């Protein structure tokens, strides 16, 4: 199961920093996707949240309008403005001074967009606020 693998990959870091990851997942939810690509994408999103959170992360996996919705919420400071304002695949204004190159979101959008079903493509978007007040990474797969 995708969530178990991601949680196990981050268990050591989570325990060392005494961070809490809560999982909310709809029961009996099955979806077709490239397992390895989505595990890597989700692992990167969780690792980023662990890097910037204060103490808590919420991993939510639900079905919404015939789509799979995977969200990673954290209680950190949120995403930088340049990342929130970019709808493009490329990150034209990296913040190298703060180690924000935008490559992670670039690859996440490529991976999401490679997942198609009935003429729709997967998407990734970033917001601030969310259930824990910090950044929210949202992956939607058709």
Give the ranges of each region predicted by the language model.
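Glycine-rich ATP-binding loops of the HATPase_c
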Residues: 113-129
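Short conserved segments within the C-terminal catalytic ATPase subdomain
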Residues: 13-22
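Short beta-strand/loop element within the Bergerat-fold HATPase_c
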Residues: 56-66
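A residue-level detector for a conserved hydrophobic packing site
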Residues: 38-39
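Glycine-rich phosphate-binding loop
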Residues: 97-110
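Conserved micro-motifs of the catalytic ATP-binding
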Residues: 30-33
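Glycine-rich/acidic phosphate-handling loop/turn and adjacent ATP-lid/helix
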Residues: 73-99
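Conserved polar catalytic motif of the HATPase_c/GHKL fold
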Residues: 43-44, 48
């Amino acid at each position: 199961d995708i969530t178990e693998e991601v949680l196990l990959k981050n268990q050591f870091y989570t325990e060392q920093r005494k961070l809490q990851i809560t999982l909310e997942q709809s029961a009996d939810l099955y979806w077709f996707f490239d397992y390895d690509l989505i595990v890597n994408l989700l692992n990167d999103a969780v690792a980023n949240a662990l890097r910037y959170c204060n103490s808590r992360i919420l991993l939510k996996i639900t079905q919404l309008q015939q789509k799979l919705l995977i969200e990673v919420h954290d209680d950190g400071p949120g995403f930088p403005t340049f990342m929130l304002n970019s709808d493009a695949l490329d990150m034209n204004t990296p913040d190298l001074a703060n180690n924000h190159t935008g490559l992670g979101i670039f690859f996440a959008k490529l991976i999401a967009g490679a997942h198609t079903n009935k003429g729709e493509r997967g998407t990734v978007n970033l917001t601030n606020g969310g259930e824990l007040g910090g950044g929210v990474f949202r992956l939607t797969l058709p």
